[in-house]
Amino acid sequence: MNKLLPALAAGLVLASCKPAVSPGVAIFESFRYEGRDAVYEAHPLPTKDVVYNPILPGWYSDPSFCSNGEGDYFLVTSTFSYFPGVPLFHSRDLVNWKQVGHVLDRPSQLTGLGRQHTSGGIYAPDIKYNPKNRTYYMITTNVGTGNFLVKTQDPFGAWSEPILLPQVQGIDPSLFFDDDGTAYIVNNDDAPGGKPEYDGHRTIRIVEYDVENDCTIGERKIIVNKGVDPSAKPIWIEGPHLYKIDGKYFLMCAEGGTSDQHSEVVFRADSPMGEYKPWHRNPILTQRHLAADRPVPVTCTGHADIVKTPDGAWWGVFLGCRPTEKGFENLGRETFLLPVRWSEDGFPYFLGGEETVPVLVRVPGTRVEGTPTFGNFVVEDSFDGDKLDMAWMTLRGPADGLYALKGGALELTCSPMRATRFETPALLLRRLQHHAFSASTRMRFAPEGSEAAGLLLYKDERHQYFLKVCLVDGAPAIALERSGETLSSQALPKSFNTVDLCIASDDGLTFRFGYAVDGKEMRTLLASVDASYLSTAVAGGFTGTTVGPYAVK
């Protein structure tokens, strides 16, 4: 059934003023994304103070958030080799989130990104607020250049140029500002002496940070070696965050690797430098022990961060995945929200025993308003502004000169830069956020030679589907390409004005690719196309799938 292949004449927005089609240029008059996951239809929000998990669906991994103590919360996630880097979300209540920009929005902040693979680049950003100097800090890893931080006193405005931290080796740095003004950086690094006893043997290290001079002080110290139970040879202790709560220092870390064995664990000490002792009931969050066939499973949970609200409650965000009934997913690691509980012996935790990550979460005293970031929704972009919507991303750089907003449309210039290479192609991508979805566009394009334009489903350089208008044997055609291999093609009329393109899925298991010429009935080019090809289970990597316009020659 073609439940999500609509007649696009009704669903797509037509530009009132249509610019002429220039040679080598594809004109996209509109783009429409619709999510229809059955889980949301089966679980309607019962009251206005209830939200859906995930609060940020789609590939929003490694979340970190902070509070300024005045009712503002800011949240960031990883972007790897996408540009701009590190989306910045703002909320006043932990429920209504709005993207207000990107922390890394110019090439000078993202040096070394140009030749990295899709899952390289920016790892695990951490955002903190320092009340002593009323400054926000974002610290992160650029796989190409090392660890760095940027800062600002106005998070809605521009952030500083990178401050490099060459003494902080490893990944996943996080800042902590103590009550007395002292600051520290904790992060994941190699085994002691660079000599791991087994694969996945890592450490958490700490170093003091000079806030006035923006540099580290003294030697780094190992505060966790291997993990909670060294005798069990735990792997990938990482993603650390340090907090001071009621006079004690709590170190929260991810452990187990970021796949289905992922977890969150906690340690406690009397001093920032340790000795850190693990809670005897660790992990404080995991789903790895639960039955795979449980209803509405969430897997891979971990990499958490917590904040305190003005009323004294604690809340946390963490990443997780929502697999399909066959166990794979294309959405990537998403951002979830849960209240933090406290044990009788004074440790924070999220879930215990057989508890599962809930679909619905009540946040007392709040009210869902406007257009939420979660649940089922429709996004339409008619490209009639002077700036791109913040959801759009390019790869490795700003793609200057390859796209333009003109006459109420998006123009992409066909480029020899290809999405199958470590380059910056002529494309704009947004996150896939639902298993059941449709992504569609209305395009005007007259291909010449090897030119092609259309919609790209992108996981990485080696895993992608391209629904394109091109020439086949010198005549216009619609074709579906899988990472350079043509799967299907059909002839188009010799003369046409617009082509509507649609990629859809009912359940995240397979894709359907369709098209319509000059607003006529939608036709299916190819259905039942394997969706697992783009999944992390097949392709690997740390990102989810993205979709959007693409032009190449």
What are these regions (language model features)?
Residues 15-16:
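C-terminal motif of bacterial Sec signal peptides marking the signal peptidase cleavage site
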Residues 19-553:
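Carbohydrate-active catalytic/glycan-binding domains of CAZyme proteins
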Residues 2-7:
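Sec-dependent signal peptide recognition
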